[in-house]
Amino acid sequence: VSTDADANLGTTAVREGFAFDEAALADWMRSHVDGFAGPMQVAQFKGGQSNPTYRLKTPGKSYVLRRKPPGALLKGAHAVEREAKVLVGLEQANFPVAHVYGLCTDNAVIGSWFYVMDMVEGRIFWDATVPGVSRSERAAIFDAMNAAMAQLHGVDYQAVGLGDYGRPGNYFERQIARWSRQYCDDTDAGRDPNMDRLIAWLPANIPANDDATTITHGDFRIDNMIFHPTQPRVLAVLDWELSTLGHPGADFAYNAMMYRMPPAIVAGLAGADIAALGIPGEADYCAAYCARTGRAAMPAYDFYMAFNFFRLAAIFHGIKGRVIRGTASSAQAKERVAVLPELMALAWQQAVKAGA
């Protein structure tokens, strides 16, 4: 993987409909960003982020701007103010995130709310098998990812001003109800017997007396992390759009889904010779997280897995509905729809493993 963020994330000229008044932004930067000095060049990151993301390059340093999209928005979606809030809180806890310089809630500056943060330079590994590094470094990279997740779940969210960042408690109940409703309501995308079985099984099998609450990332994958250019060290965890107060076991199992996920669905390790690669096995990876977080074990781990596969299948099912309705036309969206039956079958397999 290139150590150059341009090659990893790829910038392009600002796309039509996403341009803004760069002079107005430069004025805001001068007032809010210590040490800012122009001139400033603006480029847009490629990729279909729901919040358009830009690189602001000056002779001295580069910054990243994330904004709400222009135009009418769904209530609660594109909440850049939540992203900025969690980043500020986590930086106070010395968790590896990009430094936020400021949040702007005045539409007059560039047309929508935005925040500006540091551009963190390093390596992003798009493939979970982490090609191009030595076996020992690969092991250390996985250990660093495991340690980062344990550190996140150990943050005292009240102490860093995130006590109101979500609803503590009943996480599984609320999430299962939400995704079940979304699946059932999207009649265009149809029904699947594996999903129907999960919708019946999951709420009846939520582990008792298991109501821990921590900050959860919601999409903790190796490709959402920036590693040091030459060391197996996490410099920043990216993409906090799905973060909330949630259940740490669910967040950890989402990360560990890579062990049970074929590479064709989402960056997965299923079928890879992980021992030859130097990647810890699933049981060892789980034990390392438990040791770091003071747990003797994770008895409900297979339930957490079933829940996460179900949640991901529900998200992909929603994409299928949008493809059918013609509101999601990207090649990536169509690829996700193609693997949906396999993903739903895999989700039910996790429930069987958990005793269904």
Regions found by a protein language model. Name each.
Residues 250-293, 307-326:
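Active-site activation/catalytic loop segments of kinase-like enzymes and analogous catalytic loops
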Residues 39-201, 205-215, 229-231:
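ATP-binding pocket architecture of kinase catalytic cores
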Residues 166-167, 296-308:
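All-alpha amphipathic helical-bundle segments outside canonical DNA-binding/catalytic cores
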